[in-house]
C-alpha cells in the first residue's frame, strides 16, 4: 500500500518485546499517552506509542527498542540529558534538535553514539 507510513515489526518476538517495554514502564509509574498495544491480531503491527513519566530504571530508558515505543522525559539541564543518553549500552544513533549552532556542536561532541543527527531524522 503506497499510503503506508509505518510498516510491521519483523515478527511476533518484536511485538512481545514492545508489549514488555510498555508493561515494564507502566509498572514503574510510566503513563502511556498514545498507543501501547498491537494494532490488530493480524500481522505484526504495533501502534506508535509514547510513554511519559518513565523512570530512569525502566527498560525503555536503558535500551534501544527497535520498535515504535518512545519515552518522553523532562530534564533540568544538558548535563542531565547527556548522562541519560550516554547511559545506554549501545548508543547506535542520537538526535539533537536546537536553534543554536553552539549548542548543537557542544551536545553532539559529548554524545557517545555511533551517529548524531542534528535537526533531522
What is each of the regions a protein language model found here?
Residues 1-20, 37-45, 62-67:
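Flexible, acidic loop-helix segments that line cofactor/substrate-binding pockets
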Residues 22, 38, 45-121:
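Conserved C-terminal structural/oligomerization subdomain of aldehyde/semialdehyde dehydrogenase
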Residues 32-35:
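A short linear hydrophobic-aromatic micro-motif
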Amino acid at each position: 500500500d503506497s499510503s503506508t507510513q509505518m510498516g510491521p515489526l519483523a515478527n511476533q518476538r518484536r511485538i512481545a518485546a514492545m508489549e514488555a517495554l510498555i508493561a515494564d514502564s507502566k509498572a514503574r509509574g510510566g503513563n502511556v499517552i498514545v498507543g501501547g498495544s498491537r494494532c490488530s491480531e493480524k500481522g505484526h503491527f504495533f501502534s506508535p506509542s509514547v510513554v511519559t513519566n518513565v523512570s530512569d530504571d525502566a527498560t525503555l530508558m536503558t535500551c534501544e527498542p527497535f520498535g515504535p515505543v518512545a519515552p518522553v522525559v523532562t530534564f533540568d539541564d544538558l548535563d542531565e540529558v547527556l548522562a541519560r543518553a550516554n547511559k545506554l549500552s549501545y548508543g547506535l544513533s542520537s538526535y539533537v534538535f536546537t536553534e543554536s549552532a553552539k549548542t548543537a556542536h557542544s551536545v553532539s561532541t559529548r554524545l557517545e553514539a555511533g551517529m548524531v543527527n542534528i535537526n533531522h531524522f
